[in-house]
């Protein structure tokens, strides 16, 4: 029995060697997926599992499904996709881990001048994936040799989007990062990788775009041909990502979900031809929901109410982030996932709001 159990566990955690791609909850490679980690209060059962449940959506989905297991497990999409990072044979890979709130270490870095941006690039000579997320202190450094989920990220909602790309697309992706100006806390970029991706080498060194325009939009094509639009801005752009650029670029009103327990929150904006509304409550379809308020949700996403766009990124709507780098990744096939989630939003009549910087919520960005 013990032998059979060991074999089953090995099969569950098996990732084919040389196949560097996003992996879905099914355990099979997928072109892309989105994971929505639910706030802690929406869980049930064992208290240790509360705050680790998630919803899942990928290229094959018609609706959100419950995640397999928990977000801190390598049986699920996020953990399984990141497994190659923590293997002993990862010397053949290139990776860049960035986060304005990196995992704790003895080396303290001031991230206030860097972009408000979080993500992972993981690639080999054939291609790899870009994981964009909202999770502080995540993922662990490669030297930890184990995947884990930060305990401090269990309480609030989080979003993660993973897209598999051919190697050539990382040229454009790395250039986008010169605008978002990420704080890189772990990387390996050696030999051919450094030569092939000079922009990525500049990013690792802490360099950024030096002249305007201070924003950049590029079309990216996944391994299976899905089209994504990447929007990136540097701090000198000096405006809100959503009302100052994205709504006009997409030609549509936006409903934006972001972290609303910080100072300087920007109210809904109806001053332009395209309006931008702050989402105040999110609800998953069905009688079981769940539903939760924006003050319980650290995720960053937006949707055009009448279609056809939805975006997942790493930027909030607040005054400080008008002057910081960051961005979002948009796609039309994401619209059917996010449109049903908006339950309530703030009308433009409300001029201002203020949330205290209480601990621990106010320490998050």
UniProtKB/Swiss-Prot annotation:
One annotated GO biological process: apoptotic DNA fragmentation
Signal sequence segment: 1-19
InterPro entries: DNase_II (IPR004947)
Glycosylated residues (UniProt): 215, 269, 293
Localization of this protein: Lysosome
Swiss-Prot/TrEMBL catalytic activity: Endonucleolytic cleavage to nucleoside 3'-phosphates and 3'-phosphooligonucleotide end-products
Disulfide bonds: 22-162, 270-348, 311-330
Active site, UniProt feature: 298
Chief location of this protein within or outside the cell: other
Keywords of this entry: Apoptosis, Developmental protein, Disulfide bond, Endonuclease, Glycoprotein, Hydrolase, Lysosome, Nuclease, Signal
Source species, domain of life: Eukaryota
Biological role stated in the UniProt entry: Hydrolyzes DNA under acidic conditions with a preference for double-stranded DNA. Plays a major role in the clearance of nucleic acids generated through apoptosis, hence preventing autoinflammation. Necessary for proper fetal development and for definitive erythropoiesis in fetal liver and bone marrow, where it degrades nuclear DNA expelled from erythroid precursor cells.
Membership in a protein family: Belongs to the DNase II family.
The protein, known as: Deoxyribonuclease-2-alpha
Organism, as annotated: Bos taurus
Encoding gene per record: DNASE2
